[in-house]
Amino acid sequence: MTRIVDIVGREVLDSRGNPTVEVDVYLENGVFGRSAVPSGASTGAHEAVELRDGGKRYQGKGVEKAVAAINGEIFKELGGRDARNQLAIDQAMIALDGTSNKERLGANAILGVSLSVAKAAAKSFGLPLYRYIGGTQAHLLPTPMMNIINGGAHADNPIDFQEFMIIPVGAPTFKEAVRYGAEIFHTLKRYLQDAGYNTNVGDEGGFAPNLKSAEQAINLIMESITSCGYKPGEQIAIGLDCASTEFYKNSLYAYEGEGKCRDVKEQVEYLAHLVDSYPIITIEDGMAEDDWAGWKQLTQAIGNKCQLVGDDLFVTNSARLRDGIKMGAANSILIKVNQIGTLSETLDAIETAHKAGYRAIISHRSGETEDSFIADLTVATNCGQIKTGSLARSDRLAKYNQLIRIEEMLGTQARYEGNWHRR
């Protein structure tokens, strides 16, 4: 009854108006699962490869080749297989692709099928997706990291860092955490308007004002927090995504907005200064993706008082994560399903992190869709943290709203532990 009888891929558009892959997987019992695949702007060099068409159509970004692979080779391989055996299905697609980075069939094609198989199987059992993937122990709601000021590759402004996030560590529930964030978001908008800055939003729904430095952005956020009546550090903490690979050139970190360059030692000292000066509890990609020595220095300097997250460093890849664990680089991993390309490999990366005492944070991409899969995945894996953008744009709010629903479904079983960083 749960055997795959059809797979239909199609080209749809993501939140940036670029083509992406959507997949329907149909089972013999009549149910189907549908998933749409996200896409990143600042992508790590070691990520699985999404297949694009090239040529003039959609300025080269079409995904008809990936769709053809889904409707052809992949369906031929998976037709008749049992959707309940996620690992075997994912391994079959990896073997069919035959490359180390999924470049032949495309990680976007493979991932769309992988996620849709899980959704179809969950429906077959009559279970919510988070319960199907995570079992009976899935009841931890994530602390959201809300990206309310955008810079770097996510915005057209001089700010070098990519994301400035608020984290409602003192909220009693996930629903209240969303309220805290929304109130600060709208207060920040008023502050920016009063100061003469534009309030257009970037790819992830955060504001993209023409600020010059990280400190300027953080100070605006601090004012917004206190203006709402919240206590910085106690109720609302701050997080940064430096995306430092984007401005790492010739072994230097080139801050164009500030007009200065920092070597590795100076970069470590600068980030340590920010952590000492503000209630910053998490920094993502503080060093460049291949600056392993810099990562080790940063972890030794502030890893005991700040979550240091590897995104471009680890790219949701268990092998790279194990290298980092051995070296003592970072203490957490960002999990993006499209960086690795299958649900099974994603779950393996999370398990590898947890076994080593590293935290795992589930994340969206800057090019998103209305698909809320990562909301369920966060609860399923008890990761306890999620990055899914600001309090604007329906592609971001789809995930927050799904988490509110999950919290409601869980009832008295639901737990929200905003103060994870104090444990």
UniProtKB/Swiss-Prot annotation:
Catalyzes the reversible conversion of 2-phosphoglycerate (2-PG) into phosphoenolpyruvate (PEP). It is essential for the degradation of carbohydrates via glycolysis. SMART domains: Enolase_C, Enolase_N. GO terms for cellular component: cell surface; extracellular region; phosphopyruvate hydratase complex. Its cofactor is Mg(2+). PANTHER family: ENOLASE (PTHR11902:SF1). PROSITE patterns: ENOLASE. Keywords: Cytoplasm, Glycolysis, Lyase, Magnesium, Metal-binding, Secreted. Signal peptide: none annotated. GO terms for molecular function: magnesium ion binding; phosphopyruvate hydratase activity. It comes from Bartonella bacilliformis (strain ATCC 35685 / KC583 / Herrer 020/F12,63). This is Enolase. The active site is at 204 (proton donor), 336 (proton acceptor). Mg(2+) binds at residues 241, 284, 311. Pathway: Carbohydrate degradation; glycolysis; pyruvate from D-glyceraldehyde 3-phosphate: step 4/5. GO terms for biological process: glycolytic process. Binds a second Mg(2+) ion via substrate during catalysis. CDD domains: enolase (cd03313). Its EC number is 4.2.1.11. It is an enzyme of class 4 (lyase). Belongs to the enolase family. (2R)-2-phosphoglycerate binds at residues 162, 336, 365-366, 387. It is found in: Cytoplasm; Secreted; Cell surface. SUPFAM superfamilies: Enolase C-terminal domain-like, Enolase N-terminal domain-like.
